[in-house]
Design a protein with these regions (language model features):
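Glycan-processing catalytic domains of CAZymes
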Residues: 1-257
């Protein structure tokens, strides 16, 4: 090959272009300019035919823990969960009511009363550091509060409880950040639980069969949820992109006993 041919022939390879459903023309233009040999999606939707016809490799995002609300709604007991601790509440004379969801978006989480709260919840006297016996407190579903009928006056108390993640935290983050409107909240589901595990394996096989144009699956969120907590006004309250604390349940905890 002479020098002129070497310098004039278009070079391709080792460049992957992210794309989305509403930027197809721009994607094609950048592919040509940069000599990209692969395309990856940003939102997990099907690729437009125009992009499939480019001959480039297709990298498709695949979500194992969401994007099937029909399944999640049919099996609410296998929705992902996390532990939440309330703020500190000071007892006065008489009963103390501790609201569980204060400071937490009701769109994001829902209190789990399906599993035995006496076993999986904990009320702690923070002034002494000692847990309160289950028979000394009760949960009032109507008010959403844990009630201590006879607390120690001027002692501080907290409640730790399980909550379902009824809106995938990352999906909520994307929606809030980008100002999305008129869309369905994606519900999480726990792929480690028996029914969802079997469903997930079949769902993956079906996706592969039905998307033969995809060269590489880009798995995102294998089984855990990032710990992203929003308040009632959808403001970020706690953000941890590295932790796994939003991936717990009585079923999983039982595996460690």
């Amino acid at each position: 090959m002479d020098d002129q041919t070497r310098h004039t022939r278009p070079l391709t390879g080792r460049v992957t272009i992210p794309t989305d459903m509403d930027v197809v023309p721009q994607t094609l233009e950048i592919m040509k300019r940069w000599g990209a040999d692969a395309i990856r999606d940003c939102d997990g939707t099907d690729f437009p035919q125009q992009l499939r016809d480019t001959g480039a490799k297709v990298y498709a995002t695949y979500y194992t823990t969401r994007k099937d609300n029909a399944w999640a709604k049919a099996h609410p007991e296998e929705v992902q969960q996390c532990y939440i601790m309330t703020g500190f509440y000071t007892a006065q004379e008489g009963p103390l009511a501790i609201p569980l969801m204060k400071g937490i978006s009701p769109e994001l989480m829902q209190v789990n009363t399906r599993d035995d709260i006496r076993r999986w919840w904990e009320v702690v006297d923070r002034s002494t550091g000692k847990p309160i016996p289950p028979e000394a407190w009760r949960y009032d579903a109507e008010s959403g509060c844990v009630i201590l009928d006879a607390p120690e006056a001027y002692h501080e108390y907290t409640v730790s409880f399980l909550a379902y993640l009824i809106w995938d935290p990352v999906h909520m983050y994307d929606a809030v950040t980008n100002g999305w409107k008129d869309f369905e909240h994606q519900i999480t589901f726990d792929v480690r639980q028996p029914k969802t595990h079997a469903f997930t394996m079949e769902r993956l096989r079906r996706f592969i069969r039905e998307h033969d144009y995809v060269d590489v699956l880009r798995f995102t969120t294998f089984f855990h949820q990032f710990t992203l907590v929003f308040d009632e006004h959808c403001r970020e309250k706690y953000v941890d992109w590295y932790g796994y604390s939003a991936s717990v349940s009585p079923y999983i905890l039982g595996q460690f006993e």
